[in-house]
Curated annotation (Swiss-Prot):
Swiss-Prot/TrEMBL keywords: Amidation, Antibiotic, Antimicrobial, Cleavage on pair of basic residues, Fungicide, Membrane, Secreted, Signal, Target cell membrane, Target membrane
Protein name as annotated: Pantinin-1
Tissue expression as described in the entry: Expressed by the venom gland.
Annotated GO CC locations: extracellular region; membrane; other organism cell membrane
Organism encoding this protein: Pandinus imperator
């Protein structure tokens, strides 16, 4: 009975260590993914939002339309 209890306690401790380590690893992977994609990539944005920017001139819009034909 004592042996089973010791094995159970060691298993519980190892499982807790695994869960804490996995959370750290998954957290770091998620941070890396977010830094690669960036803020705009994770937002639900239309790709044509820049066309409505007031800083774009008519020539810029014409060039963009030619590029995407």
């Amino acid at each position: 009975m004592k042996t089973q209890f010791v094995i159970l306690m060691i298993t519980v401790i190892l499982m807790q260590m695994l869960v804490q380590t996995e959370g750290g690893i998954l957290g770091k992977l998620w941070e890396g993914f977010k830094s690669i994609v960036g803020k705009r990539g994770l937002n639900d944005r239309d790709q044509l939002d820049d066309l409505f920017d007031s800083d774009l001139s008519d020539a810029d819009i014409k060039l963009l339309k030619e590029m995407f034909k």
